From Swiss-Prot:
HAMAP family: Ribosomal_uS5_B. Part of the 30S ribosomal subunit. Contacts proteins S4 and S8. This is Small ribosomal subunit protein uS5. One of its GO terms (molecular function) is structural constituent of ribosome. The gene is rpsE. One of its GO terms (biological process) is translation. SUPFAM superfamilies: dsRNA-binding domain-like, Ribosomal protein S5 domain 2-like. Residues 17-80 form the S5 DRBM domain. GO terms for cellular component: small ribosomal subunit. Coiled coil: none annotated. The keyword Ribonucleoprotein applies.
Amino acid sequence: MDEILEEELEKKESEEFEERIVEIRRTAKVTKGGKTLSFRVLAVVGNRKGKVGVGVGKAREVPEAIRKAIAAARASVVEIPLYKTTIPHEVFGRQDASKVLLRPAAPGTGIIAGSTVRAVVELAGVQNVLTKCLGSTASVNLALATLNGLKDLVSPEKAAKLRDITPAQVLYGARKEA
């Protein structure tokens, strides 16, 4: 009975998250006996409703590396606040030498981003955003920088409570009262 419930839970979890392989890279370790080949995979999982995760997997075979990357991505899933179809405010994500600027955009703008950042943002559920990558463009670091930036997002309600103003003032700027 417990096995059936566990299987159903696993099916629901796998159906809930969409998986995307961003990069498969062949790496080589040079040894006395020659080169030892292995593969590194960067995967992103998300439900397009505010949950997203990034993972890296390494193995001698591609399918095993993919499995490990997806497992790592599922383990790193974080929830982010969304405001309509965009992010609530501008945010800057960093990972090592990679930096990513994420800006909210008007409806109809779409996702203005490179392939790595686009994968993370799309699977998070953001439909309109402007991004700019600064520094290193290594795909793993860009994906992690984007995730770090998304982690730093604060919902308008929470920001308003912290700053003791209304959520509208957070989103549209403070207006002078006559």
